[in-house]
Amino acid sequence: MTTDAVQTMIPTLDITERPAPAPRAKVEAGVKLRGAEKVARIPVKIIPTTELPKKPDWIRVRIPVSPEVDRIKALLRKHKLHSVCEEASCPNLGECFSGGTATFMIMGDICTRRCPFCDVGHGRPKPLDVNEPESLAIAIADLKLKYVVITSVDRDDLRDGGAQHFADCIREIRKLSPNVMLETLVPDYRGRMDVALEITAAEPPDVFNHNLETVPRLYKAARPGSDYQWSLTLLQKFKQMMPHIPTKSGLMLGLGETDEEVIEVMKRMREHDIDMLTLGQYLQPSRSHLPVQRFVHPDTFAWFAEEGYKMGFKNVASGPLVRSSYHADEQAKLVKASLVS
């Protein structure tokens, strides 16, 4: 599809490979690095953007101010929980919180990776909070939620990548809220896939989600420390172990990919038995993050959705403000019903 007429192009920022940085003292556990500090030691050099691009008319986000937003934030603080909605500066925070839903981020708010598209802080995480599974379960019961998404920071410091902590959270949640549907948005479990999947299969979610994030050509710049094929294999292996559970993945558009590359990744997803797809616009969190290379028009997102359904995806959520957990409850119900029938 020719998209010149439906995209606002942004000049490419110089992202160049650089030599490995000199060793330095370890960051103290619990110290969160963000922005320029976070991306200072990744394999590519990111030159800070002098001026953030003007967003087109189709990207307008209301300020998340309402009693329900305040109530959920207060509850999260009470139980010492984190939401990815806040940590990753999600544009749908107001809509989701106002609707009484949230995506919970477990295992702390400090990530062991330095992905330069992401607004979550980097550093040396503190030890896992053994009370978090119970606290999360109580919060979900208090909110009377029917559908919950659980995600996490990357925890490369843990032998199982945090898989057992996910399982513990699922078990505790189902004790207090047996009818709730649970979606997990997991890290890639780098170097520990098999043990992580064995743990996951013993306490499975209702939807298993892991995002590819971008096309393989851009992995070195956007996902340092991650591997495109590894992520595809993780999703496929889970599906082989638990064929009745939907698998899900997503891409951010606007990092410099072409439409043809997006279509190719979608084809690869289907070859790896992925059931559900999300496509959304990348929005640069700060001047120190990867720059937006284009704003994809809603018509192009609609075209991707059409192509996705032709390929056999059971659900495609594709739009400028779509994120992994956006209207996830509605999508999951449709897909679960189709897998059962």
Swiss-Prot record:
The keyword Endoplasmic reticulum does not apply. Coiled coil: none annotated. [4Fe-4S] cluster 1 binds at C85, C90, C96, S325. Its main location: cytoplasm. It comes from the Bacteria. InterPro entries: Aldolase_TIM, Elp3/MiaA/NifB-like_rSAM, LIAS_N, Lipoyl_synth, rSAM. [4Fe-4S] cluster 2 binds at C111, C115, C118. Its EC number is 2.8.1.8. PROSITE patterns: RADICAL_SAM. Binds 2 [4Fe-4S] clusters per subunit. One cluster is coordinated with 3 cysteines and an exchangeable S-adenosyl-L-methionine. Its cofactor is [4Fe-4S] cluster. The keyword Acetylation does not apply. Residues 97-314 form the Radical SAM core domain. Pathway: Protein modification; protein lipoylation via endogenous pathway; protein N(6)-(lipoyl)lysine from octanoyl-[acyl-carrier-protein]: step 2/2. It is found in: Cytoplasm. SMART domains: Elp3. It catalyses: [[Fe-S] cluster scaffold protein carrying a second [4Fe-4S](2+) cluster] + N(6)-octanoyl-L-lysyl-[protein] + 2 oxidized [2Fe-2S]-[ferredoxin] + 2 S-adenosyl-L-methionine + 4 H(+) = [[Fe-S] cluster scaffold protein] + N(6)-[(R)-dihydrolipoyl]-L-lysyl-[protein] + 4 Fe(3+) + 2 hydrogen sulfide + 2 5'-deoxyadenosine + 2 L-methionine + 2 reduced [2Fe-2S]-[ferredoxin]. HAMAP family: Lipoyl_synth (MF_00206). Belongs to the radical SAM superfamily. Lipoyl synthase family. This is Lipoyl synthase. It comes from Pseudomonas fluorescens (strain SBW25). The lineage of its organism: Bacteria, Pseudomonadati, Pseudomonadota, Gammaproteobacteria, Pseudomonadales. The gene is lipA.
